[in-house]
């Protein structure tokens, strides 16, 4: 979402499930996928107010993130979040800083429209640090992850990637 200065300071609301984000002159990132348990709202600059089910209201300041689970209606606020990690996609890269392979592969799966299967469940929690350009082909990314020793091997079958 662009800064409000680009829109003459006009405030607006973003509705997501039972969450309402009131934009009060700001730039923020909302990560809300249907198949994810949690919704993440990260403030880059300005200020936002998040209302949950018209009951609880949370004000967010820059470098803060709200993690909300709509199933349990639990909410937590994280301070001093590395905002670049959350918005790097806007700059054509995925920035994986200490993320578990399971989470990384979920992002890769969405971007390249493939199903990812882990044959060895132990590697799902293996942490990876790296930056991957979004315009790279999937084969190059898989080769790099293999060369870093994160996975032993992989196999591609049409729209499925099997990690070994």
Please describe what each predicted stretch is.
Residues 1-164:
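A residue-level detector for the "anchor" residue at the start of short, highly conserved motifs
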């Amino acid at each position: 979402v662009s800064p409000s200065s680009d829109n003459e300071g006009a405030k607006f609301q973003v509705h997501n499930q039972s969450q309402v984000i009131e934009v009060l002159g700001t730039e923020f990132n909302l990560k809300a996928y249907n198949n994810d348990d949690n919704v993440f709202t990260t403030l880059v600059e300005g200020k936002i107010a998040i209302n949950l089910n018209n009951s609880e209201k949370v004000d967010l300041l820059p470098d803060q993130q709200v993690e909300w689970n709509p199933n349990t209606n639990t909410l937590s606020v994280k301070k001093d979040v590395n905002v670049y990690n959350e918005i790097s996609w806007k700059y054509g890269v995925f920035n994986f800083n200490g993320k578990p392979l399971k989470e990384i592969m979920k992002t890769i799966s969405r971007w390249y429209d493939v199903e990812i299967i882990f044959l060895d469940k132990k590697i799902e929690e293996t942490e990876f640090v790296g930056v991957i350009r979004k315009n790279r082909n999937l084969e190059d990314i898989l080769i790099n992850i293999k060369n870093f020793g994160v996975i032993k091997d992989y196999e591609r079958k049409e729209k499925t990637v099997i990690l070994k």
